[in-house]
Each structure stands twice: as structure tokens, then as C-alpha cells.
């Protein structure tokens, strides 16, 4: 049996374009995706290009802290 902390953790990815537009009130919302990452293989923050339904294009999504 494994002891200690779980290796796989759930993370939330957030669109950085929507966050920047939030200050200008142009965006209707903020796109967020939920996924898992392996803490040992990727100790840094995740960054993916995913589709944002509010921007209507593929944008960079960064991991946010809970």
C-alpha cells in the first residue's frame, strides 16, 4: 500500500485571455477545465492550449491554485 500523499492530484486550468478581458468587461465568462496531473512527473504548473468557448478560439490555459 502507498503511504503519504497521493501522487495524482486534481488541478483546474483557466483561460488567461478571459482573465485579462475580465478587467475590460468584454468577456461573458472564464473558461475552466478540470484534469489530473502526476505530482512526481510534472512538479511545475501545467499549461495547455485548449478551446475557450467564450473567446471562441484555442487559447492558453494555465493551472490555478485552489
From Swiss-Prot:
GO terms under biological process: translation
Stated family: Belongs to the bacterial ribosomal protein bL33 family.
GO cellular component: chloroplast; ribonucleoprotein complex; ribosome
Gene Ontology molecular function terms on file: structural constituent of ribosome
Top-level taxon of origin: Eukaryota
Primary location group: plastid
This protein's UniProt keywords: Chloroplast, Plastid, Ribonucleoprotein, Ribosomal protein
Record's subcellular location: Plastid, Chloroplast
Protein name in UniProt: Large ribosomal subunit protein bL33c
Coiled coil: none
